[in-house]
Amino acid sequence: MIAAQAKLVYQLNKYYSERCQARKGAIAKTIREVCKVVSDVLKEVEVQEPRFISSLTEIDARYEGLEVVCPTEFEVVLYLNQMGVFNFVDDGSLPGCAVLKLSDGRKRSMSLWVEFITASGYLSARKIRSRFQTLVAQAVDKCSYRDVVKMIADTSEVKLRIRERYIVQITPAFKCTGIWPRSAAQWPLPHIPWPGPNRVAEVKAEGFNLLSKECYSLTGKQSSAESDAWVLQFAEAENRLLLGGCRGKCLSVLKTLRDRHLELPGQPLNNYHMKTLLLYECEKHPRETDWDEACLGDRLNGILLQLISCLQCRRCPHYFLPNLDLFQGKPHSALESAAKQTWRLAREILTNPKSLDKL
């Protein structure tokens, strides 16, 4: 048994140093190329409208606010200033979303975003995005990369196609620190010792983001009130939780397997599903020793089996917001074929670790 585990860990480490590192290198090169274009577009936006200041900065070879959806698709979060005059209201009526309401006694004119406040005093995510979309469209025509970048039409999101190969979504957002959403109040679960009180305090202080984008749970049926809502995002909190042990390596292997074998019609699975299931695996195995290098094979196997279970049940709850289903709106047939393909993959890796040389 121990020999079989050791063989799997050896093969996974080999896979990590060959396949995963090559993937990381290729993506890093793409990110540099894409960010040159996006920075140029955002610089042009800022000239037209100084309220939209580019926050895309490189820190320690990483771009703050950039998320890799898949090797050809990225999301850049553009942090906006001055949320101060609004209260954060999160009553759970829209899973995964919250609203920003003008604080009592505050005048509209005190807000930097006065013309985007609705009659009932809400700061409209949709109105801000619509204005930003117009500015980006103008900037694309003026910027020095105009020959290689185009706006993607037929969407309320701000999406660019770069060199006909890459898609970048630029999402206006507010950073919320020092508060924690009521809809995530059940975290951490009281009977689970992970991640421990110090890490919990760090994560809650890190806070979350409010994004101006279409909400998972409302796609295709948004009323105007609902489309004024902001989408909750916890990227920094999640990244902080995944520090230490073989968690990062495990995520890297999962993303590489997804890119190479689970990029299926109907797009049932993305990197975020993998990250979510890794967080649940951390809860199931709360001891740090469960995340030693020698346990990499067991952890990966556990996550793949959990993924199959979620695909078969057609439900994948968000880690912090369990009322939000990350499979919402995905075609059942796509989830079914992803379950079959994941099962083939898991069986292959478990029964024949050497197959990783070909995967």
Curated annotation (Swiss-Prot):
Q: Which domain of life is it from?
A: Eukaryota
Question: Listed GO cellular component terms?
Answer: cytoplasm; nucleus
Is Cell cycle there in the keyword field? no
Q: Which InterPro entries match?
A: Mab-21-like_nuc_Trfase, Mab-21_HhH/H2TH-like, MAB21L/cGLR
**Main subcellular location:** nucleus
> Keywords for this entry?
Cytoplasm, Developmental protein, Nucleus, Repressor, Transcription, Transcription regulation
Q: Where in the cell is it found?
A: Nucleus; Cytoplasm
Q: Which GO terms describe its biological process?
A: eye development
Q: What does this protein do?
A: Required for normal development of the eye. May promote dorsalization of the developing embryo by antagonizing the ventralizing factor bmp4. Functional antagonism of bmp4 may require interaction with smad1. Required for gastrulation and subsequent neural development. May function as a transcriptional repressor.
What family classification does the UniProt entry report for this protein?
Belongs to the mab-21 family.
PANTHER family membership: CELL FATE DETERMINING PROTEIN MAB21-RELATED, PROTEIN MAB-21-LIKE 2
What protein is this chain from? Protein mab-21-like 2-A
Q: Which gene encodes it?
A: mab21l2-a
